[in-house]
């Protein structure tokens, strides 16, 4: 893509010069950011595909499944949502239902449930058409709705889908259609011309190919007339309509394309897991996909890929099957990073990290001297850093509720922190970060799953208040 | 006098009684949605979870005062205390949510506060999950206040107060209805007759204009969140007393139905929210009575879609005029 020599249509001089007025970031982060911003799209895609292609050669099967396949699935889901929310600006909170419909449809078309075994070349296109049609119908019923109404109707639609597959389970051909809470099991692997994708490596490469194809198609779509019209619609529907852009048709198209991609992801998900159940399509997965799209930056394809990688890696680190040691190392690393990034000067960040460490040892020593029972607890099992943490974080013994109180105190402390002025805030960071460590060791380590949902929820709130455009999104320039 | 009814009228009356009590809860939740929407044009997804937190505050007071089996207080002051604590706690929570999650986004693009609201909802759900665990917590309202709870002798809350054609109306159902009516009357008076009510109406009508007239709109918005959340907190305790069980996920569906009620009645309209709540409650009761409980959500969802298609401004709402 060549640099345009004059401002884009609809952009005046002040807006066009906006980027030049921005301060460029220095250091590694700035370099990476500039590289990502200026590297042409094919180079970015090639770099991603080349790196992702090496994964099966140095990862074992379990890791490939957890990191490789799931990241790619999240990318695919994020790409579909990006079309609806990122390009067209429609807040679709029923997106997961399309994913679910895709997974269930594939499950019914290719499994023992009804004894139908269609090959993937027949079932995947059919399922995609089906989900696109459902998306279209939902879009038609709600096309007159403004943003918020649309959000609630789609949210309700997603919930109605879960209730439908879980509880309603209507009988078709003498068998519950959706299998109720148990879902559909024994789903076939993807089959092309009699060849079945059964190993993780094969599934991974198929998924990678799919993601690359979808990424390419979406790139061209977003640069096309349709893509520009979507963005116009997102920025100002009324002005877009006045410019004779067919608003309704574009909305429906975005809905249908997003739904079709979600349906495709559903097919692959069902075939890889070989079973689907209502629990896979609830609110948590919706939040995860939103976190991916928003973290990366709404409307940015590179952002979706990066967001999916970051979210899935932190997800797997906080998964209960993983040894605690990884989660702990990651958590403290992120805490230190936040501390360094929270202040402008690097030396101050380093000083703060040091201050937190000293603060911890001092607090622990005081507690031990004053009330030994409050520091007698043992650190939760697990590897690296455990010995250090044992002497650094206050872990009471026999005070069951301590973790809960610490958690509430942490939430209050963070809220207060955001209201403090200047230096007070910097100073208050130290005890707050230490409190976060206490909460982690006393409460979060025992329920890592809940902890990660809490962190994701906070991430959404925090990102919206601090940087609503996400990591790679372009900030809106408002002309007043 | 017996009315000639072709169908099982006992079942019908029972469902009506259930529907009215359920509708009271939805009406209270819907009021919070409708007030916030009217004033900020913001869809507060977290409202259902404020209701859930209210139910848990009531539970906390109950178990803090000796638990449902051997409470330290007599029944009346105990229930009153639960209501007051839950209402005050939820109200403060609403103010804090507005202050930290929505106010910084007042000038942001329209998507930002919605996503932030989604985050708040998810955060509250999982915080309660972390603090209280995934198991159901029970108010034990069946034996609450009973002289002999160990043998499950029913308490006074489920005593029949009077009968309608052989169908019992329990004390708790009457309390729910009366408290709801009382709160609605108080709210209507507050909005119609007081200074702060006038400021609320002005802010809802035109925020910038109100600001220029010297109204501290930020405070008015905070106050609106407070009132809405107070009502949700009261509804949370009522849910606990009616159905005995509270859990961390209860706010999600209740929030959706409360919102449906607000939309059906006409969003932004206070009498509309009350009417909508009643309609949704009755529909849900009839749907689960005649088709089975598993279809209740699907039927309510169908009503939402239908109303939005036929009369998008709701039953009592005024159509929005778009100014270019």
Task: Pin down the residues of each PLM region.
Chain B
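Membrane-interfacial amphipathic/re-entrant helices at transmembrane-helix boundaries
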Residues: 1-29, 57, 68-82, 108-112, ...
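Cytosolic-side transmembrane-helix boundaries in multi-pass membrane proteins
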Residues: 2, 10-11, 131, 205-212, ...
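Inter-helical junctions in multi-pass inner-membrane proteins, predominant
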Residues: 7-25, 169, 190-195, 221-261, ...
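Single transmembrane alpha-helix segments in multi-pass membrane proteins
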Residues: 12-63, 96-112, 264-270
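Helix-loop-helix "hairpin" substructures at the membrane interface of multi-pass membrane proteins
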Residues: 22, 165-246, 270-275
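Short loop segments and helix-boundary regions at transmembrane helix junctions
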Residues: 38-46, 92-138, 190-197, 202, ...
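Alpha-helical transmembrane segments within multi-pass membrane transporters and channels
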Residues: 69-120, 127, 275-280, 284, ...
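Transmembrane helix-bundle core of multi-pass membrane transporters
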Residues: 104-105, 113-193, 220, 286, ...
């Amino acid at each position: 893509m060549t640099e345009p020599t004059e401002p884009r249509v609809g952009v005046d001089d002040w807006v066009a010069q906006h980027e030049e007025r921005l301060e460029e970031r220095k250091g590694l982060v700035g370099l990476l950011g500039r590289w990502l911003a200026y590297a042409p799209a094919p180079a970015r895609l090639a770099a991603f595909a080349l790196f992702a292609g090496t994964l099966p050669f140095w990862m074992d099967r379990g890791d490939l499944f957890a990191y490789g396949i799931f990241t790619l699935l999240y990318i695919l889901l994020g790409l579909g949502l990006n079309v609806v929310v990122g390009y067209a600006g429609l807040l679709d909170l029923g997106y997961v239902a399309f994913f679910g419909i895709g997974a269930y449809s594939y499950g019914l078309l290719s499994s023992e449930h009804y004894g139908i075994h269609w090959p993937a070349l027949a079932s995947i296109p059919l399922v995609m058409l089906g989900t696109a049609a459902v998306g279209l119908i939902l879009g038609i019923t709600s096309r007159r709705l403004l943003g918020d109404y649309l959000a609630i109707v789609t949210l309700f639609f997603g919930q109605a889908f879960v209730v439908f597959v879980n509880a309603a389970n209507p009988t078709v051909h003498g068998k519950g259609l959706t299998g109720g809470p148990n879902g559909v099991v024994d789903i076939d692997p993807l089959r092309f011309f009699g060849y079945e994708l059964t190993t993780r490596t094969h599934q991974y490469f198929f998924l990678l190919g799919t993601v690359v194809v979808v990424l390419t198609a979406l790139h061209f779509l977003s640069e096309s007339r349709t893509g520009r019209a979507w963005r116009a619609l997102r920025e100002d529907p009324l002005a877009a309509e006045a410019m004779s852009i067919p608003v309704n048709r574009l909305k429906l198209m975005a809905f249908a394309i997003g739904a079709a991609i979600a349906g495709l992801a559903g097919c692959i998900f069902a075939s890889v897991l070989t079973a689907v159940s209502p629990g896979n399509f609830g609110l948590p997965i919706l939040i995860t996909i939103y976190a991916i799209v928003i973290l990366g930056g709404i409307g940015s394809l590179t952002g979706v890929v990066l967001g999916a990688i970051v979210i899935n890696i932190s997800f797997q680190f906080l998964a209960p099957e993983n040894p605690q040691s990884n989660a702990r190392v990651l958590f403290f690393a992120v805490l230190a990073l936040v501390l360094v990034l929270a202040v402008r000067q690097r030396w101050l960040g380093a000083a703060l990290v040091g201050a937190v460490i000293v603060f911890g040892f001092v607090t622990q020593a005081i507690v031990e001297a004053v009330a030994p029972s409050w520091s007698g607890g043992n650190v939760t099992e697990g590897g690296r850093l455990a010995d250090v943490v044992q002497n650094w974080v206050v872990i009471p013994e026999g005070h069951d509720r301590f973790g809960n109180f610490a958690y509430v105190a942490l939430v209050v402390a963070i809220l207060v922190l955001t209201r403090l002025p200047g230096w007070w805030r910097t100073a208050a960071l130290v005890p707050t970060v230490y409190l976060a460590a206490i909460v982690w060791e006393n409460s979060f380590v025992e329920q890592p799953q809940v902890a990660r949902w809490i962190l994701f929820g906070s991430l959404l709130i925090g990102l919206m208040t601090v940087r609503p455009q996400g990591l790679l999104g372009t900030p809106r320039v408002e002309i007043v | 006098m017996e009315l000639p009814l072709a169908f099982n009228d006992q079942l019908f009356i029972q469902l009506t009684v259930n529907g009215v009590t359920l509708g009271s809860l939805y009406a209270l939740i819907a009021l919070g949605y409708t007030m916030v929407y009217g004033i900020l044009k913001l869809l507060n997804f977290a409202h259902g979870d404020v209701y859930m937190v209210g139910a848990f505050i009531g539970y906390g007071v109950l178990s803090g005062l000796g638990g449902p089996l051997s409470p330290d207080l007599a029944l009346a002051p105990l229930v009153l205390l639960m209501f007051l604590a839950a209402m005050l706690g939820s109200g403060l929570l609403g103010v804090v949510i507005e202050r930290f999650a929505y106010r910084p986004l007042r000038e942001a693009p329209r998507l930002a506060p919605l996503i932030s609201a989604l985050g708040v909802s998810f955060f509250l759900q999982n915080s309660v999950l972390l603090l209280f665990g995934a198991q159901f917590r029970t108010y034990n309202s069946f034996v609450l206040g009973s002289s002999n709870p160990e043998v499950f002798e029913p308490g006074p809350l489920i005593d029949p107060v009077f009968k309608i054609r052989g169908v019992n109306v329990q004390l708790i159902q009457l309390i729910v209805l009366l408290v709801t009516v009382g709160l609605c009357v108080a709210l209507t008076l507050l909005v119609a007759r007081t200074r702060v009510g006038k400021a609320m109406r002005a802010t809802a009508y035109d925020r910038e204009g109100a600001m220029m007239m010297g109204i501290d709109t930020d405070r008015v918005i905070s106050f609106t969140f407070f009132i809405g959340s107070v009502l949700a907190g009261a509804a949370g305790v009522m849910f606990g007393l009616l159905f005995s069980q509270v859990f961390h996920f209860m706010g999600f569906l209740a929030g959706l139905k409360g919102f449906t009620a607000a939309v059906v009645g006409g969003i932004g309209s206070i009498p509309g929210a009350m009417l909508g709540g009643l309609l949704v409650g009755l529909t849900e009761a009839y749907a689960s009575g005649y088709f089975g409980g598993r279809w209740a959500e699907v039927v309510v969802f169908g009503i939402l879609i239908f109303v939005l298609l036929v009369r998008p401004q709701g039953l009592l709402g005024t159509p929005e005029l778009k100014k270019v």
